[in-house]
Structure formats: structure tokens, C-alpha cells
Design a protein with these regions (language model features):
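N-terminal membrane insertion elements
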Residues: 5-19, 25-29, 59-61, 68-170
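Acidic di-acidic motifs
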Residues: 1-5, 52
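Acidic, metal-coordinating helix/loop segments flanking the phosphotransfer/catalytic sites
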Residues: 22-72
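Conserved signal-transmission helix
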Residues: 172-174
Length: 174
């Protein structure tokens, strides 16, 4: 989570890393107020937060170096005094081209065409309008982590198949 507002970090943590106390609170609230659809997750997400793009880049570079890359980054568009969201995304992708990104913004001061022109067409970018709904964050995190995981598995299988083809080709040449 890359956002200059610490309360946004807490919001993401409450959604993606609910502790047992908050689950009990949700159940009590549901019983009391009749809310039959509280957000629940069995997924285990590792959530790290940065208040500026440069700090996020350092986290991503370290994760890649340690071979524990991030699957998804939720990135705010406005983070004064540092990089804006687009510069942050460009630098994050330079460090890890497989990273899935969700732009989180309350403002529409940058038209989609400008965003697309700057970073190109990609299936690795989604937009989440603030204020966001908990289920939207949870669904985005779940789906994008799954997409990222499947892409890694496919890349591994393609590599294995390529190696197998190379080996068979060498055998046939002999």
C-alpha cells in the first residue's frame, strides 16, 4: 500500500489482515444490526505500507532481491512532496515488471488517456476510486494475487517446456 495518508494504511490493514478481535467485532455487529454480509476473508495477505513512492520502491527492490516479490501494489495518485502515483508505478514496474497495480484516487485530475499515454496499455493496471468499499479492495487483492500467481506458474511451465524441446532437439541431432 503506497499512500501518504496513514489512516488509509490502517483501512487496508483492517480489510486485508483482519485479526481475531476484529472478526469477533464484525460478528457481534452483524448480530446486533442484522448485517448478514460482513467482509470476511480466509486469505492470508502480507501487507506492507509506504508513505511515499521512493519508500515503496525500496520495499519492492528488497523483495525482488530476496526472491519474495510482491504480487500487488495499491498506489495513491497524489503523494506530496514526493513522486506522484504515475512516477511511482513506472519505477515499481522498472524494478518488477510482473507487479500488478491498482491506482487508488479520490481525484479525477488526470484523464485516463493521459495515464494510458504515459504508461501504455497494460492488463496489470486497475483503478479504484476513493472512498472505496472493503469488498472491492478484498476482491481486487484476491483476484490480482491469483492472476500474478498463475502468470508465474505459466512462465515456469513455458521455461520447462522450452528446456525439454532444446534437450530433445540436441538428442535428434546426435
Amino acid at each position: 500500500v503506497v499512500d501518504d495518508t496513514v489512516s488509509i494504511h490502517h483501512d487496508f490493514l483492517k480489510i486485508l489482515r483482519p485479526d481475531m478481535g476484529s472478526k469477533a467485532l464484525e460478528q457481534a455487529r452483524g448480530s446486533l444490526f442484522g448485517d448478514s454480509n460482513p467482509v470476511r476473508t480466509n486469505d492470508e495477505f502480507t501487507v506492507n505500507c509506504a508513505d511515499q513512492g521512493a519508500a515503496a520502491l525500496a520495499l519492492v527492490e528488497t523483495a525482488v532481491k530476496e526472491r519474495k516479490p510482491y504480487a500487488v501494489a495499491f498506489v495513491d495518485m497524489r503523494m506530496p512532496p514526493g513522486w506522484d502515483g504515475l512516477e511511482t508505478i513506472e519505477r515499481l514496474w522498472a524494478a518488477d515488471a510482473a507487479l500488478q497495480v491498482v491506482i487508488c484516487t479520490a481525484y479525477s485530475d488526470q484523464p485516463w488517456e493521459e495515464i494510458r499515454d504515459r504508461i501504455g496499455r497494460t492488463d496489470q493496471l486497475l483503478i479504484l476510486q476513493k472512498p472505496f468499499n472493503s469488498i472491492e479492495v478484498l476482491q481486487l487483492a484476491t483476484a490480482l494475487c491469483r492472476k500474478w500467481d498463475l502468470a508465474r506458474k505459466v512462465a515456469g511451465q513455458v521455461s520447462e517446456l522450452s528446456q525439454l524441446v532444446d534437450e530433445r532437439t540436441m538428442e535428434l541431432r546426435q
